[in-house]
Amino acid sequence: MRIYDPFRKKWIEEEIETPFPSKGLVATFPFVDLHVHVRLNGGEDYSSLEEASLVGGFFKVVVQPNTKPLIDSKEVLERHLDLSKNRAVEFLFAVSPFGSIEAEGERVVGFSTDGIEYDYPTLVETMKKKKKALWFDHSQMYEVDGIFYEGAPLPFQKRPRSNEAIAIARTVLTGLEYGFERFHIQHVTTKYSVEVISFLKNLAKVSCEVTPHHLFFCYEDIKNTNFKINPPLGSPEDRRALIEAVKKDVIDVLATDHAPHHEKPDDFLTAPYGSTSIEIAFPAYYTALGDLELVVKKLTKKPLEVLGVEARLTEDTLVFIDPEAEFIVDAKKFKSKGKNSMFDGVRLKGKVVALKLKGRWVMIDGEVIADQKEND
């Protein structure tokens, strides 16, 4: 079997025993997602998110803080740590910078502003006081806002496409002034943001990510409320700029922003933001970019670099992929409790077939193996 090592940028040929037909498959290091959401309280819990992650080929994910209640206190964080422990997927946490806790301790990787509305004075005061850590930034100027970007063919309040880029510059420059050194810009959406990030990389340690939906769709593709996401879909020109930025390494990481909702109303004004994507992230990225090595690098090596984690490829921990398989997405079959995917009904190329972690088969052909001890 052909194995791709993203850390050495090298293809290897090895014989690997599998409990499924392996002709035509390739294997590589399992995926890392820097951006997922959990709902609890009847929504996406850690069991369903774990299953969805494994089906997608992910073994390590970073949970964002905008749960109910926010992960902004020791008590709430400890609850999440307890609910997510002892699982096949390693759940890491980015906590709110606006609460009473610091970004330190067990499985905590940094601060995140994702899904938290704040103003500039609050940002300044927070950056002055908090211990310096990796800062995940949802870059948005809430003072001038709207459901979609200007140019979207829908009769709703719009936000300028420059909104995100201005917020990115504001966060990074303010953070530098108050001692922050590492910034990770979340879900980049416009050509303006790409240009600003490219410049800021000369001043600070800045990385960024893009979602599968922003690479695959633009605002001309909006059909229903599954396409209501924050930040919104950009223009066709923005989508092309994002693809080019991934190829040129201006965009470092591919991250899903997996935002599950069991049901979304048909009304754009009342429907929540978000799209479910972690189970079909690899094929969505592969279909959009068409470069297996590039996609694997930005789902493995690059997100681990953002986290400051060193890793190496071993034969007991692999994800198995069929790069030629094509299928039509059926969101009703997702393991996630969220069926709100804008990819529903879309034909994609590339399929995650199986996942092996520390010598144990944890997922085969879309089914999670419940009792992993049976693999011993």
Curated annotation (Swiss-Prot):
- Residues noted as binding Zn(2+) 2 in the record, renumbered to the chain: D114, H138, H187
State the name under which the record lists this protein. Answer: Putative dihydroorotase
Entry keyword GTP-binding: no
**What's the name of its gene?**
pyrC
Question: For this protein, what is the EC number?
Answer: 3.5.2.3
Family membership noted in the UniProt record: Belongs to the metallo-dependent hydrolases superfamily. DHOase family. Class I DHOase subfamily.
* Species this chain originates from: Thermotoga maritima (strain ATCC 43589 / DSM 3109 / JCM 10099 / NBRC 100826 / MSB8)
Give the catalytic activity.
(S)-dihydroorotate + H2O = N-carbamoyl-L-aspartate + H(+)
Q: Which cofactor does it need?
A: Zn(2+)
- InterPro entries linked to this entry: DHOase/Allantoinase_Hydrolase, Dihydroorotase_CS, Metal-dep_hydrolase_composite, Metal_Hydrolase
Single GO biological process annotation from the record? 'de novo' UMP biosynthetic process
GO MF annotations in UniProt: allantoinase activity; dihydroorotase activity; metal ion binding
One GO cellular component assignment for this chain's record is: cytoplasm
The job of this chain, per UniProt, is described as: Catalyzes the reversible cyclization of carbamoyl aspartate to dihydroorotate.
Catalytic site residues? D257
Q: What is the lineage of its organism?
A: Bacteria, Thermotogati, Thermotogota, Thermotogae, Thermotogales
Q: Which pathway is it part of?
A: Pyrimidine metabolism; UMP biosynthesis via de novo pathway; (S)-dihydroorotate from bicarbonate: step 3/3
Q: Where does Zn(2+) 1 bind?
A: H35, H37, D114, D257
Per UniProt, the keywords (alphabetical) are: Hydrolase, Metal-binding, Pyrimidine biosynthesis, Zinc
Q: Does the keyword Nucleus apply?
A: no
Q: Where does the secretion signal sit in this chain?
A: none
Cofactor, free-text remark: Binds 2 Zn(2+) ions per subunit.
> Which residues take part in binding substrate?
H37, V38, R39, N66, N230, H261, Y273, G274
